């Protein structure tokens, strides 16, 4: 076989689906709109290759790592990824110009001789791609830039076992030598001694140069195209007569090539190397990995996608991780609980717990989107558990549980202490285990104990309450020092839901009429209040002080804007007011007296608040405040009527 061009087998690519998943992750979290070249690395196997197979370059999720451990049967191949932002950008790229530019990178390493120390500069690859992250589709095109040099094959000879035997031990020594792996695929052979190309200057271009090449192809009598740039390099350095020992470790015959440079190199190097499709045509490939990936993982990535787009396109400072990692407790799984949980899902929250002691009724599904008609049958399914199951159907990776328990209510006497104490203990445990608590119940007194506990355990607490055409959304102020409550500066913390009241919570549910038992409210009010409550929670997390953040109407309070304490909305005139109220020193839920009493007596304190109507008012001083206000009112009336009053009572009107 004489006077012929060198027979080459082209390189084929193999892309593990994990590579595309890694691209998606990096695109969202790191690269964003940056479409500059990104360094990657692939690998080629030279031992475990099937029969009659071309060189196969593999990439996977590890291709982006700086330090990769390779087996003794692999060579690393350096490359770049150019991932474009739109499919139009991909189409507009001048493919020939791009290929030539990559060839010039190889050519430069030959000009400056850096390739002699790092042969991987001669075997580089690139990927031009576009990632459709919503559709989980990837358009990509591999290229293996090969500089063109024309060589004439004078002789191609297979190596018999006896001919290759003298080289076997040398090959094993070479592969195990303490050299960078990038140096080992090709080498100089000098009297059966293998030498790195760093020593090329010791050899004269006038003599025939013997080189060894460890082939990564198994096609009979064809060299891997990885040899192309090595031969171009030698031609550039003036070597025109070369004998190539093509060594194979894959049960196919090794062979030698005696070659001579057929044409001088052109002044402008020409580059080939775009990968062809399975049909032998030039063109990109399409990978649709949606069917290959766990659907739950696809859902996870899709949820993150919208949030990450919001972050790096609009608000880079937004801390999504703190939102995602927050554990949220929803006290109430009805209308407000349903809508709040859906907004939280949209924000990427992964841990939501429901507490409710009700069952799904036939009036619920139309207003409460976590329930459907079948949940109303057979007496109704438990709301909390059903809501948790519904969230898992919407997003399987959510951690969600429902607890069917009754929150102990101030003014509602203890009737079954064992059960109510268990409910109390469970509530305390749940509040301790979570980062934020939403009070979404439909009665005033059910909010009392959670308000106390959130202050004692320093938890973010948000209340949402509805009227017919109005709503209240507010965040509770917390103690700055829960260990030493007596040292607390009350004037510097925000108030809670009960701070505007001059009476303690009492039983408001007994003997209610039908219109009082049902939530009578315009249907849209719940959506407004729920969305504002969830958004307020997200804004709180963006403030460094979290639950201790002061109320601020300035747009720069957080990266999301202002951070109010209260939002009161009215649908009759479509207005929303931002209000602020500091802690009330006689508050029945967050005053120093109440918090100290709870810390010292816990359940016994709660029992007294449940059993005795006036206990909280006496404890906090509200009883005295009411008495004093009644005396003051009486004295003012007497004054207005022109009646005399004693000097000792004058303090009430001065």
UniProtKB/Swiss-Prot annotation:
Belongs to the ATG7 family. E1-like activating enzyme involved in the 2 ubiquitin-like systems required for cytoplasm to vacuole transport (Cvt) and autophagy. Activates ATG12 for its conjugation with ATG5 and ATG8 for its conjugation with phosphatidylethanolamine. Both systems are needed for the ATG8 association to Cvt vesicles and autophagosomes membranes. Autophagy is essential for maintenance of amino acid levels and protein synthesis under nitrogen starvation. One of its GO terms (molecular function) is Atg12 activating enzyme activity. Keywords: Autophagy, Cytoplasm, Protein transport, Transport, Ubl conjugation pathway. GO terms for cellular component: phagophore assembly site. Residues 615-654 are annotated as: Homodimerization. It comes from Komagataella pastoris (Yeast). InterPro entries: Atg7, Atg7_N, Atg7_N_1, Atg7_N_2, ThiF/MoeB/HesA, ThiF_NAD_FAD-bd, Ubiquitin-activating_enz. This is Ubiquitin-like modifier-activating enzyme ATG7. The active site is at residue 518. A motif (GXGXXG motif) lies at residues 332-337.
